[in-house]
């Protein structure tokens, strides 16, 4: 891992956080008690709780694999998944049971600024990509969910920190090795309305 990269790993499950701490320590990425020299910080936050999300600080890039299995699809999962994976990690506890609740929540957090993204990654001129052409969010999605998630983010209205125009959010969909739509990638571009293409 590059010394200038700092990762904040976030989860709401105590067992997952403990395992992440063990992994960071095993790979000498943990520094000294979550100090500034740590390359990986492990933090608790619940995506459904505004306060815990607001305490996280700001990021250049958010990578997320939220629960996306619909509640009624749990029993139909292959036993190799259902019997060994956490129900909370796959289905979660979002009020909506269609598997899209966490994406709606992510989009709302993005619009409200509760997922705080660094201004330094934004382009100097409207319409240009930001520093290093980094997206601001990368999210794994379930089968058939990419079009809805993409549409939600492309119509998101995110106010620029200094006022003025809203950011323009543009999305792309990446496919896995089997050709399935697997990841929605979000870019935030400077000024000029909202929407995307």
Summary of predicted features, one role per range:
Residues 1, 85, 140:
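Acidic-residue sensor for enzyme active/binding pockets
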Residues 1-74:
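Conserved SAM/SAH cofactor-binding pocket of Class I
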Residues 16, 77, 145:
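Short phosphate-engaging motifs
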Residues 21-22, 74-78, 150-153:
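Short amphipathic alpha-helical segments
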Residues 65, 81, 106:
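Conserved RecA-like P-loop NTPase ATPase core
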Residues 68-101, 121-124:
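Mobile active-site "lid"/loop adjacent to the S-adenosyl-L-methionine
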Residues 94-188:
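Conserved Class I SAM-dependent methyltransferase catalytic core
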Residues 190-197:
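Flexible, glycine-/basic-rich loop-and-beta segments that form/coincide
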């Amino acid at each position: 891992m590059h010394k200038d990269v700092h990762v904040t790993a976030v989860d709401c499950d105590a067992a997952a956080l403990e395992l992440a701490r063990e992994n960071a320590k095993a790979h000498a990425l943990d520094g000294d008690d979550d100090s500034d020299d740590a390359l990986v910080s492990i933090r608790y936050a619940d995506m459904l709780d505004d306060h815990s999300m607001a305490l996280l600080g700001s990021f250049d890039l958010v990578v997320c694999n939220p629960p996306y299995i619909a509640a009624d699809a749990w029993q139909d999962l292959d036993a190799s998944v259902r019997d060994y994976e956490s129900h909370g990690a796959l289905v979660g506890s979002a009020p909506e049971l269609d598997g899209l609740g966490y994406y709606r929540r992510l989009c709302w957090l993005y619009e409200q600024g509760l997922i705080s993204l660094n201004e330094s990654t934004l382009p100097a001129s409207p319409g240009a990509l930001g520093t290093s052409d980094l997206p601001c969010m990368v999210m794994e999605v379930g089968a058939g969910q990419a079009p809805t998630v993409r549409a939600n983010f492309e119509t998101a209205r995110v106010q620029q920190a200094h006022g003025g125009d809203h950011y323009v959010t543009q999305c792309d969909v990446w496919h896995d090795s089997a050709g399935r739509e697997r990841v929605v990638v979000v870019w935030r571009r400077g000024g000029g309305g909202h929407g995307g293409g």
